Amino acid sequence: MKTKTQLLLDIWAEARTRLQKQMDLISPEDLGKKLGESPNSIGFLLRHLADVELLFGKNVFGSPDIKVIAKTVIDKKDTGEWTELAALQRYVDEAGESLKEIIAQQKEEDWEKEIHTQEFGTKTLAEAFARIVSHTAYHTGQIAILQKYGHA
């Protein structure tokens, strides 16, 4: 029988496969794609997903090893600078690996402890964890739409 940690890690890994599959389809020319006057490009959203995964590992899971300058969160808008596909892929991969390692380190009792963040208040770690899963899925869906219908 799997532990809570193993089950939650499986859920996260399966949900994140949608992002990986989408990334496999992205070309350098896609990074600037937006829909009409929408504020975010594919490049920005990829950087944002990785920024937030790293912030999550640092602030929600309390990892002292993670160092992150979350430019997309700081700037709060697409500055047009996220145009290097290889660099974005590395950053997304590194963020995913960091978060995966942190999830795997959790003890069974950790999932029921309460944490508090400015973004979503007081939640159990398991409830907070659902936020990163849904955040990644939400923006991955946006990326898919931008890739299919967007214009640079």
Features from the language model and the residues they span:
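Short, contiguous alpha-helical
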Residues: 5, 9-13, 20, 28-74, ...
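Acidic/histidine-rich alpha-helical segments that form the ligand environment
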Residues: 77-113, 127-132
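Hydrophobic alpha-helical core bundles mediating ligand binding, dimerization, or RNAP-core interactions
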Residues: 12, 16, 23, 92, ...
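Basic/polar N-terminal segments that are highly enriched at the extreme N-terminus
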Residues: 1-3
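Generic structural signal for secondary-structure transition and capping sites
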Residues: 17, 28-31, 54, 97, ...
